[in-house]
């Protein structure tokens, strides 16, 4: 996240029809908010197709489900439909706490036809090749957007959906501002009973990958860590990572001022997260809980939070009920109230979002592809 990922909340303001070509500030609930999901190059800055909004990992029907959402239309009428035909969309899987991924599922798309449909291909890369860009990998299946494709215990669907994410963005403003400034969080004027879902009626492009429990590496009981990335072909013939994300809400909370989308976290491998950002993030969390009086050991709490969130890889035990909640962070379902959990974590106290999973019940399904196509 983000990627927003990724990241929703980064896209704060945007009921006013912003163009994704502009990274200027907008005002929500009386304060300025940056539109801060990563824009890493001039080309990326013009293309929401590369912006990761969310990633989900959960148990399906005797399977593991991986979902990556990109290209939210909350950025306005200039959003380009579909997936970028010169990009790669990758799910990265680590096993048993390993530093590097040894399984990558890579999804690519061709240019859209007259009906807006795109040919899609899924490749799998294993071992050391899973973290490299040059290997082609094994072609698993080929299909078209808007239609399910399957082969060898793997199913893939990609297309436009109703966005299942939910948050009242005015609450975000009350938390990420203090995190940035190291001041106390003041929720005295926050009224959870009046919360509204800022993402109601919005749409995203979604990639849904379902892998059978018969997969030799993804059998029940296997401990995995998952993150996703978008990559864009370069003029030199290589690939540049544009966005990536594991845990939800990372950019909206910790890097809300990344208005030019040049934060090095965009292109960094998760294995470098703690070294690059651990001290900085721990200090900010410590300052917030110290000012808010929610911890007797602010420095220790800040370090504890960072140790939980870095590397930015979402943990999951294959075959178990997924939940991104207060009891555990084990994968993430479409219903989970991830913003409430993440905001509470950095605040050091419970933050009531005022929203329940039922607010977006109509934006998710019980069967493959588990999302609601539009």
Where are these regions (language model features)?
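Extreme N-terminal basic, low-complexity initiation segments
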Residues: 2-6
């Amino acid at each position: 996240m983000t990627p927003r990922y990724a990241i929703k909340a980064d896209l704060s303001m945007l009921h006013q029809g912003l163009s994704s070509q502009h990274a200027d500030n907008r005002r929500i609930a009386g304060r300025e908010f940056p539109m801060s999901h990563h824009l890493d190059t001039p080309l990326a800055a013009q293309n929401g197709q590369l912006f990761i909004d969310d990633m989900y990992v959960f148990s399906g029907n005797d399977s593991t489900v991986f979902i990556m959402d990109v290209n939210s239309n909350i950025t306005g009428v200039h959003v380009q439909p579909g997936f970028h035909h010169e990009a790669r969309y990758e799910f990265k899987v680590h096993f048993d706490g390993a530093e590097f991924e040894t399984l990558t599922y890579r999804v690519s798309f061709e240019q859209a036809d007259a009906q807006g449909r795109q040919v899609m291909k899924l490749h799998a890369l294993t071992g050391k090749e899973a973290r490299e860009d040059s290997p082609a990998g094994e072609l698993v299946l080929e299909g078209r957007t808007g239609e399910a494709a399957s082969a060898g215990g793997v199913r893939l669907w990609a297309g436009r959906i109703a966005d299942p994410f939910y948050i009242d963005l005015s609450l975000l403003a009350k938390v990420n501002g203090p995190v940035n400034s190291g001041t106390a969080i003041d929720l005295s004027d926050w009224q959870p009973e009046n919360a509204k879902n800022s993402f109601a009626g919005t749409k995203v492009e979604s990639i849904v990958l379902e892998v059978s429990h018969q997969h030799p590496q993804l059998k029940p009981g296997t401990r995995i860590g998952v993150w996703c990335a978008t990559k864009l072909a370069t003029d030199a013939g290589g690939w540049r990572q544009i966005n990536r994300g594991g845990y939800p809400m990372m950019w909206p909370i910790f890097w809300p001022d990344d208005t030019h989308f040049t934060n090095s976290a965009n292109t960094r491998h998760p294995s470098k997260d703690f070294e690059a950002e651990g001290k900085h993030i721990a200090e900010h969390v410590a300052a917030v809980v110290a000012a808010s009086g929610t911890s007797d050991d602010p420095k220790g709490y800040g370090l504890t939070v960072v140790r939980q969130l870095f590397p930015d890889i979402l943990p999951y035990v294959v075959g178990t009920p997924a939940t991104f909640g207060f009891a555990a962070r084990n994968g993430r379902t479409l219903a989970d109230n991830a913003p409430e959990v993440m905001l509470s974590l950095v605040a050091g106290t419970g933050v009531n979002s005022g929203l329940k999973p039922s607010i977006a019940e109509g934006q998710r399904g019980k069967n493959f592809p588990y999302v609601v196509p539009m």
